[in-house]
Regions:
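Conserved G/P- and acidic residue-centered "switch" motifs that form tight phosphate/ATP-binding loops
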Residues: 102
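Ser/Thr-glycine-rich phosphate-binding loops at phosphate-binding pockets of nucleotides
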Residues: 106
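Cys-dependent protein tyrosine phosphatase-like superfamily
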Residues: 1-96, 110-160
Length: 160
């Protein structure tokens, strides 16, 4: 059978950070992991409630961070995600983050990553929509991006 594609795969930051839907959702998980690897991805962040299971995961640095569908990540999860992506990039390992559809939870984490690099929430969400064609699903997810921004801003003020 011919490989179709991995749904919603796109780079937010070229060859550094991407988002996609659940590997194995439409194809065999191994085919999707091979596809990601062929696109240069070397680190995988899974936001689904269940861990991925495949021997091909050994090709990737893997972080499982379960978040209930249609909800937002907590502060510690966002901080862990940002640190993981930064660490992977320092090791020259482009990362992909996924949830089930690759939109809500994935978009929230991607927007928070943009905020961590100095973007205000409206700009982060605009960039997310430009690059990926999607925004966020729930008010709770938008609020998580806003709260992350204000928490970062408060922490920055305390250091001055």
């Amino acid at each position: 059978m011919e490989y179709k594609y991995l749904g919603n795969f796109s780079w937010l930051l070229d060859n550094k950070l991407a988002g996609c839907d659940l590997p194995g959702r439409y194809n065999h998980i191994d085919d999707d992991l091979d596809y990601l690897h062929s696109r240069g991805v070397r680190a995988l962040v899974s936001l689904t409630e269940q861990k991925l299971s495949s021997p091909k995961l050994k090709k990737f640095s893997y972080l499982h961070m379960p978040i209930v569908d249609m909800t937002a990540p907590g502060e510690q999860q966002i901080d862990s995600f940002v640190r993981f992506v930064d660490r992977m990039w320092a090791e020259k390992k482009p990362s992909v983050v996924h949830c089930h559809a690759g939109i809500g939870r994935t978009g929230t984490m991607l927007a928070c990553y943009l905020v961590s690099k100095g973007n205000e929430p409206p700009k982060a969400l605009e960039l997310l929509k430009q690059k990926r064609g999607y925004g966020l699903f729930t008010p709770e997810q938008y609020e998580a991006v806003e709260l992350y921004f204000w928490r970062k801003k408060a922490a920055s003020s305390r250091r001055k």
